[in-house]
Amino acid sequence: MLNIFNLICICFNSALFSSSFLFAKLPEAYAFLNPIVDFMPVIPVLFFLLAFVWQAAVSFR
């Protein structure tokens, strides 16, 4: 269980910090979308966690 938790933390941290290494900027017209674009790499991790919540809801059938 601890290994799975560590893997999730590593994936979450790499998703958060990988975007800081990319120095591309959005055009001025899309500058208001910066917070959404910064959050986008984390979305697959949330789907991964949602799978565990779903399985817990159906009692891991």
UniProtKB/Swiss-Prot annotation:
The chain crosses the membrane at residues 36-56. Keywords: Chloroplast, Membrane, Photosynthesis, Photosystem II, Plastid, Reaction center, Thylakoid, Transmembrane, Transmembrane helix. It comes from the Eukaryota. One of its GO terms (biological process) is photosynthesis. One of its GO terms (cellular component) is chloroplast thylakoid membrane. It is a single-pass membrane protein. It is found in: Plastid, Chloroplast thylakoid membrane. InterPro entries: PSII_PsbK (IPR003687), PSII_PsbK_sf (IPR037270). Residues 1-24 form a propeptide. One of the components of the core complex of photosystem II (PSII). PSII is a light-driven water:plastoquinone oxidoreductase that uses light energy to abstract electrons from H(2)O, generating O(2) and a proton gradient subsequently used for ATP formation. It consists of a core antenna complex that captures photons, and an electron transfer chain that converts photonic excitation into a charge separation. Belongs to the PsbK family. PSII is composed of 1 copy each of membrane proteins PsbA, PsbB, PsbC, PsbD, PsbE, PsbF, PsbH, PsbI, PsbJ, PsbK, PsbL, PsbM, PsbT, PsbX, PsbY, PsbZ, Psb30/Ycf12, at least 3 peripheral proteins of the oxygen-evolving complex and a large number of cofactors. It forms dimeric complexes. This is Photosystem II reaction center protein K. It comes from Gossypium hirsutum (Upland cotton).
